[in-house]
A protein has these predicted regions:
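Short hydrophobic/aromatic beta-strand or adjacent loop that forms the aromatic wall/cage
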Residues: 74-76, 109-110
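C-terminal structural segments of small proteins and small subunits
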Residues: 87-112
Length: 117
């Protein structure tokens, strides 16, 4: 993307600069097991607002429509962020850490944050 800067001192001077846009980041959570549905519900009540307050956009969540390879029917959550740094900051935020404390051992899961190509 190009941005145009207009120089007000020299009415005819334009400066073109290339705007660099950071690649988006995707947070992928997979749940291997839910050990305590009450703890998971408490986590979900806190985690959603904590993440959206930090720029998260929930793209998909739930059981897979179709599985291949190992065929594991794991609950999966896909969240988009504007950057890896934003996703990491959301994870490390006090509000999300409170959600993790509420979850405790209520689920066996994995979170991955990846940068878009």
């Amino acid at each position: 993307r190009l941005a145009v800067d207009y120089d007000t001192r020299h009415c005819q001077t334009y400066t073109y600069r290339r705007e660099t846009q950071m690649p988006k980041a995707y947070w992928i959570s997979t749940y291997r097991a839910v050990n305590d549905s009450d703890k998971l519900a408490a986590y979900a009540k806190l985690a959603g607002p904590a993440l959206t307050a930090n720029g998260a956009r929930f793209l998909a969540r739930g059981e897979p429509s179709k599985v291949y390879e190992l065929g594991l029917m794991q609950r999966t959550v896909l969240i988009e962020f504007d950057s890896v740094e934003q996703a990491v900051a959301a994870h490390d935020s006090p509000a999300y850490q409170a959600a993790l404390a509420a979850l405790g051992d209520g689920a066996d899961r994995e979170i991955r944050i990846i940068e878009a190509a």
